[in-house]
A protein has these predicted regions:
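Nucleotidyltransferase catalytic core that binds NTPs
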Residues: 1-160
């Protein structure tokens, strides 16, 4: 059985995440996803909007995922000793140095294959894009409210 490991923050799930996990799942028989701790996400990317426990629960519920676990605090490579993957799937935009990941696997006696997956070509394929789009939407609604004389209402009078 080929065990694939994929990692990520998975904050504000979007089509790019689903594509990444589907592609990772195709590389083997079992997909184990390591969800970054809040502290790790903050150190390497950004403060997550969604708490770590909620993120791991959401990822666990996704069809291609066999198991989702929270990563380790501090040493992000320590999880390799527990999961012992045959393949590590890296997203196109993940900053992990493939040579360093390979070295960490070798150091642990793991003959793990590292695969860099292609980019998802679609709209809203990143958390920052979603946040930016929401910001643009809210700014537009605020401008419309000022023009129309609305204040303190839900955008365009819609219930939230």
């Amino acid at each position: 059985m080929v065990r694939v490991m994929a990692t990520g923050v998975f904050d504000l799930l979007h089509p790019g995440h689903i594509y990444f996990l589907n592609e990772a799942r195709r590389l083997g028989d079992e997909l184990v996803v390591v969800v970054a701790r809040d502290s790790t996400a903050k150190r390497f990317k950004h403060q997550p909007i969604t708490p770590e426990q909620s993120r791991v629960e959401m990822v666990s519920a996704l069809k291609p995922v066999d198991r989702a676990v929270l990563g380790n605090e501090g040493d992000i490579f320590a999880i390799l000793d527990t999961i012992r993957p045959d393949v590590i799937a890296l997203g196109f935009d993940q900053a992990h140095d493939e040579a360093r990941v390979r070295d960490e696997c070798r150091r642990r006696g793991l003959p793990t294959r590292i695969v860099r997956l292609p980019r998802f070509e679609g709209d809203l394929d990143g958390t920052r894009k979603i946040i930016r789009r929401v910001g643009e939407y809210l700014a537009m609604e605020e401008s419309l409210a000022k023009v129309e004389g609305r204040r303190g209402e839900e955008p365009s009078g819609r219930a939230g």
